[in-house]
């Protein structure tokens, strides 16, 4: 049975406590944690996992994945990725989500990334984890675009974190058209709505944009997807809305997905 989580990144400018409290208040039982340098740094992957355990227990939440995006074209990015994998192994989180160029949208080049991804994938495999590369940036702008890169990587521990809004933001393709091409490689899904087109940052609550979530869920069900879903809302970027508005958007998103049979 798929688990529906709230993504802590939806509370980007707020503390870990505020994010977890808001996710729980909005009715979620699961969470995707965030340890993204320079963006949403709720988890200290060099610190004691007990800190996060106590926080999750306080709000009655279980972690299903962690976002640890870093620039995997660089040694520093690899080192952060390895630190996230080690933390996830200690904590017991099975999926580490990341992106080739980290959070920032940079011009990506394949060869530097290929020099490091094998090391990260081997570490994840040894730890019994999966590295899920997000639909994000240039080299993985869509599922269709990502397939040759995934084939070149050719590692069983490397899967896809499919973002239903990023695919349109970076490639112009619609999730319901692109997802069937890559559904069998998906290990994690960011359920994110969009009101904009290519290059437009406008990611509202689920149901307020034009992503066809009924179709998205049907495609993944038909593909036998059993992994987690994480609701991610990034609004119109910074500055983030007031905390109560973020929590309400997460609650409304959960209700919208319940109408499609996901709760």
Question: What is the predicted role of each segment?
Answer:
Residues 134, 138:
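Conserved anion-binding
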Residues 28-29, 33-116, 125-130, 221, ...:
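Structural motif corresponding to the early beta-alpha repeats
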């Amino acid at each position: 049975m798929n688990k529906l989580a709230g993504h802590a990144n939806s509370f980007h400018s707020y503390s870990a406590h505020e994010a977890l409290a808001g996710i729980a208040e909005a009715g979620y039982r699961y969470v995707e944690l965030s340890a993204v340098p320079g963006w949403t740094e709720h988890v200290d992957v060099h610190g004691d996992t007990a800190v996060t355990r106590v926080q999750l227990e306080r709000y009655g939440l279980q972690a299903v994945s962690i976002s640890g995006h870093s620039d995997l074209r660089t040694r520093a990015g690899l080192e952060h990725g390895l630190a996230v994998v080690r933390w996830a192994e200690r904590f017991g989180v099975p999926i580490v989500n990341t992106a080739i160029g980290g959070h920032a949208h940079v011009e990506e080049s394949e060869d530097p990334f290929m020099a490091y991804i094998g090391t990260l994938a081997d570490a994840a495999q040894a730890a019994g984890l999966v590295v899920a590369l997000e639909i994000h940036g240039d080299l993985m702008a869509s599922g269709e675009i990502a397939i040759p890169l995934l084939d070149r990587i050719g590692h069983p521990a490397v899967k896809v974190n499919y973002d239903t809004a990023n695919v349109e933001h970076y490639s112009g393709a619609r999730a319901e058209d692109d997802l069937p091409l890559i559904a069998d490689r998906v290990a994690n899904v960011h359920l994110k709505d969009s009101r904009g087109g290519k290059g437009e940052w406008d990611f509202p609550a689920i149901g307020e944009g034009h992503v066809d979530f009924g179709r998205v869920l049907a495609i993944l069900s038909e593909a036998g997807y059993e992994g987690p879903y994480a609701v991610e809302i990034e609004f119109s970027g910074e500055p983030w809305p007031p905390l109560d508005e973020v929590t309400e958007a997460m609650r409304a998103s959960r209700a919208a997905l319940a109408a499609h049979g996901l709760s």
